[in-house]
Amino acid sequence: MEKIIKESKQGESLVLENKPENTKKLFIESYGCAMNFSDSEVVASILSDGGYNTTSVLEEADLVLVNTCSIRDKAEQTIRKRLEKYNAVKRTNPKMKVGVLGCMAERLKSQFLEEEKIVDLVVGPDAYKDLPNLLAEVEEGRDAINVILSKEETYGDISPVRLMSNGITALVSITRGCDNMCTFCVVPFTRGRERSREPQSIMAEIQDLWNKGFKEITLLGQNVDSYLWYGGGLKKDFVNASEMQKATAVDFEQLLEMVAAGFPKMRIRFSTSNPQDMHESILHVIAKYPNICKHIHLPVQSGSNRILKEMNRLHSREEYMALIDKIRAIVPDASISQDMIAGFPTETEEDHQDTLSLMEYVKYNFGYMYSYSERPGTLAGRKMKDDVEEATKARRLQEIVDLQQKHAWFRSEEFVGKTVEVLVEKVSKKSKDEFSGRNSQSITVVFPKENYKIGDFVNVKITSCTSGTLKGEALGLSSMN
């Protein structure tokens, strides 16, 4: 499971610089994980070349697309409500076309197109280059569908437009799909098997971002640490690669060092990591380069060995704790965040207490916590009874959230009195006189604007904090400028 992008970003319409020669209008919304938001940038780029300018006004759109998430039932219900809204607008504008992209497209294709007849086209995550052809089908009065999962597609040849309108931070996709087959997760079924993008196309995209003034990139994938380029194809087929392909293959450690060394004045983040793929050699690269951010998102899902086995997680509690110890030893200033699921099938009170005790051991900086939501098509959905009562799930989730809040306070207070480097990203929501940005550990920092500007790297002395935000005074520009 990849962490859901900030709630404030959910459903945000993507608006880009318009081309004067384009005559059609595209309204596109994104929900779910960062990969969906990155994919929407690819889609907007493809359709910009096809004559579409973006709009934030739903009612004036010729084409409405929603990039969807299937990770939890709540996400699907939110998107269904949006589809109802689109169709209400469509009744007054029959020429408007409505399409579903992403993970729900693959899972509910027949239901959307044939049974409910609420959309005109359904396009899976690997079929976005086919959008112009599919739209031509729709213009001819036919429904259009392409949800074929690819063994090769990485969109490495598409130059994405940028969702992050601050012009400072950007997402760079490096892998697609996942091979892990966790029993609760739909990603392998909706996004296909794991494959990696050619390193030079990644470097070229980052160079383009640097030339445009971007200051920070996030290397993105469902499982970035398992990145492996050996000339193309699925990761699982690497065993059949030639000796030359194996000798010249590039793994995540090498890619991360390549990016950090190639762009020393650009901040590098990455997400998401799976514990079994976070090798010690990667930690040494993180420690070696000051421009690699000292934050590791390390989903664990449960602290119980029995539940981890039921989830088909490829690590034990003890292996996870040993990895935490390595991180603390090699990258002592790293922040660590988590994903946690409360109420997985058969979870007992003892299992839940194991989760809480693991949290006490790690004391995460922040986390993404959910109650279990049965997803059709997953192994858990097919084979396991959702037998934990909703009230019990809610109570256990609240205990996890409360403990995380306690640890977040503890970790925030560790920064008070210290000086941190902050990349200014925007004006603070709470005060127009303050800037907001993040430090290397991905913690939000606010400080008075003074004469600084968005895009500056500023040294800030932390004077106070809340559980989620650090507050301080600027000391001057950092050496990253």
How would you name each of these model-derived features?
Residues 164-168, 178-180, 292, 302, ...:
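Short flexible coil/turn linkers enriched for glycine and charged/polar residues
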Residues 186, 233-242, 381-386:
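Short glycine/proline- and charge-enriched loop/turn segments
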Residues 29, 101, 220-222, 271-273, ...:
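Generic beta-strand/beta-sheet core signal
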Residues 12, 380-481:
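Terminal RNA-binding accessory module
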Residues 30, 310, 367, 447-448:
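Thr-Gly-centered strand-to-loop micro-motif
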Residues 1-227, 251, 318-329, 353-361, ...:
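Proteins enriched for Cys/Gly/acidic motifs involved in redox and nucleic-acid/cofactor modification
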Residues 182, 202, 219, 270, ...:
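Conserved, mostly hydrophobic/aromatic
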Residues 98-102, 107, 211-350, 360:
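Conserved SAM/AdoMet-binding glycine-rich loop
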